[in-house]
Amino acid sequence: MEYVVLVDESDNEIGQMEKQAAHIEPHLHRAFSIFLFNSKGELLMQQRALSKYHSPGLWTNTCCSHPRASETTAEAASRRLMEEMGMRCEMHEVYTFIYKAPVGQGLTEHEFDHVFIGQSDDIPCINTEEVASWKYMTIDDLSIDIALYPEHYTEWFKITFEEMTHHAGLLGKI
């Protein structure tokens, strides 16, 4: 059974809860989103595995998950990037924000999200239990595709992508 770290609106830990229960009720919990870019400035996207309990088969950012109670968000980001995409990469936390979004089947993501960016030209070696496919996309192509086919993307990615474009100057930090 997996647990998430419950937090207040200042990201102070206030407890733990089983992950699926935290998405049913929903409770604010700590999360992270990774945006890896290649040297051409294209974003590495992943398609969620069809076996995922919510948002299966949808496209999202490079990696996103929840830290364990015993680890920092940076440690969790590195761990999950390796577990999902088979990659190691230096990353920098660039900002945080809170969002709440329904994800279908009566579930809602309510997250205090730590956003990390990094740069790598490595080829992913995906874990097919987590990831169905991957591709690189330019920011312009993503913006157009999200506008035309929003149903192809996870709810949190659409929110996080919009936040990321507002912080576009941060891309110079990678």
Locations of the language-model features?
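Nudix hydrolase/Nudix homology domain
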Residues: 18-20, 69, 98, 107-174
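Conserved Nudix-box catalytic region and its N-terminal flanking loop in Nudix hydrolases
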Residues: 21-32, 42-79
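A residue-level structural signature of the nucleotidyltransferase/glycosyltransferase Rossmann-like core
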Residues: 4, 42-43, 134-135
